[in-house]
């Protein structure tokens, strides 16, 4: 989180050199797309991390502010609903975030306003071609002047529903989601990711070294600390319990986004260890006809556990 160094990334489906000719001839090319950096996704509730950050940073809300979180509600001439239309009653924001209430977070987004929501998304990297030594498709947000109240409510929950000249948003890459989680773990400072640590000559001499590069302070350190606390609640007692790892505190945020043909994608962003984060993970599992509800958190937890073990072995060697 403190440097932006990318330790690993994986995209599936992939390909081998032997398959390349067949893939090109088929004209599909799906395997050639690096889904970590080039594919844009509706982030679902993982975007609520930005909504919560903006709400706290602008003093629009606090973690203890209570919200009515009905199963469905009318907003701006349209309907906002929780998953399975669950009525959560009147609850504090920290619980609404942990349980991922759309109706509560939509109210926060409307109170925040479109200008603020889009501005904070951009502060976290939206609209930027992230990467010091690789290319990333910029994540998208609408022109705030074109957003309706209903669209703003859903955008605050990570679902792009707008139809206007500017792109519907939010739309994000897996890498952008990692940058958001890393910024929260890093006291609100956004780091530009990179893959190559250093370049060596054939003789082993250091030719160049990549220096960490900040993209700015998205939110204050105090705001980041409060959002970290809320993200801990997601994994400890909310929708992200599947990411729990024995003996390690993990903080994160889940997300689910409907896609075409009744499918949906499962997201998880998180970091560990909670008190002194050294690792960040960003996961999207595409449904493609399978029920992947909650699977993003399970995969994220397993990835963090394995990487923490590797770090521990490296420190001990």
Kindly give the residue locations of the regions a language model identified.
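Beta-lactam-recognizing serine transpeptidase/beta-lactamase-like catalytic domain environment
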Residues: 1-45, 50-285, 292
């Amino acid at each position: 989180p403190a440097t932006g160094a990318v330790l690993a990334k994986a995209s599936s489906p992939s390909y081998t050199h032997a398959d390349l000719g067949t893939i090109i001839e088929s004209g599909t090319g799906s395997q050639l797309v690096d889904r970590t950096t080039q594919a844009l996704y509706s982030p679902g509730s993982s975007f609520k991390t930005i909504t919560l950050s903006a709400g706290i940073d602008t003093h629009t809300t606090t973690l203890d502010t209570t919200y009515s979180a009905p199963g469905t509600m009318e907003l701006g001439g349209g309907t906002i609903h929780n998953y399975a239309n669950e009525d959560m009653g009147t609850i504090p924001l920290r619980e609404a975030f942990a349980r991922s209430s759309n109706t509560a977070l939509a109210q926060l987004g409307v109170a925040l306003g479109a200008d603020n929501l889009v501005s904070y998304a951009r502060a976290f990297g939206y609209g930027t071609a992230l990467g010091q030594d690789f290319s990333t498709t910029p994540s998208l947000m609408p022109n705030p002047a074109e957003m309706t109240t209903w669209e703003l409510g859903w955008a605050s929950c990570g679902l792009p529903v707008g139809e206007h000249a500017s792109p519907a948003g939010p739309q994000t890459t897996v890498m952008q989601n990692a940058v958001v989680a890393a910024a929260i773990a890093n006291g609100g400072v956004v780091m530009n990711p990179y893959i190559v640590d250093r370049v060596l000559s054939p003789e082993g001499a250091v030719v160049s070294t990549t220096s960490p590069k900040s993209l700015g302070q998205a939110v204050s350190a105090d705001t980041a600390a409060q959002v970290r606390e809320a993200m801990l609640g997601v994994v400890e007692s909310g929708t992200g319990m599947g990411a729990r790892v024995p003996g390690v505190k993990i903080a994160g945020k889940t997300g689910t986004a409907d896609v075409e043909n009744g499918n949906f994608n499962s997201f998880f962003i998180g970091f560990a260890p909670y008190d002194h984060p050294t690792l960040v993970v960003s996961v999207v599992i595409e449904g493609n006809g399978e029920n992947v509800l909650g699977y993003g958190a399970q995969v994220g937890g397993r990835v963090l556990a394995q990487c923490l073990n590797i770090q521990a072995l490296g420190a001990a060697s």
